[in-house]
Amino acid sequence: MERQNIRIRLKAFDHRVLDNSTREIVSTAKRTGANVRGPIPLPTRIEKFTVLRSPHIDKKSREQFEIRTHKRLLDIVDPTPQTVDALMKLDLSAGVDVEIKLGA
């Protein structure tokens, strides 16, 4: 029989919210008897935006803003039906983007 696994990829702008959501998923999966690999921290994507400070003059005066996207990866190996049900019922924070892929 093939080993089935669930790959969960989480993204968020705030790393504290992301870590809390990751902790919830790991504890839920372990509580239902699944084997969890991770969380694996993936590289943080940094987008920088440079704008002029003044709308009229002084081209040399600029201001920079950045958006950091933090990412984590989880693998749940051999999930039980209870694991899948518990993960579906799990209520995560609003600022976390969750991608779930089922694989063999």
UniProtKB/Swiss-Prot annotation:
Gene Ontology BP terms: translation
InterPro entries, per the entry: Ribosomal_uS10, Ribosomal_uS10_CS, Ribosomal_uS10_dom, Ribosomal_uS10_dom_sf
Keyword Ribonucleoprotein: yes
PANTHER family from the UniProt entry: 30S RIBOSOMAL PROTEIN S10 FAMILY MEMBER
Homology family: Belongs to the universal ribosomal protein uS10 family.
Subunit structure, interactors included: Part of the 30S ribosomal subunit.
Descriptive protein name: Small ribosomal subunit protein uS10
Origin species: Maricaulis maris (strain MCS10) (Caulobacter maris)
Encoding gene per record: rpsJ
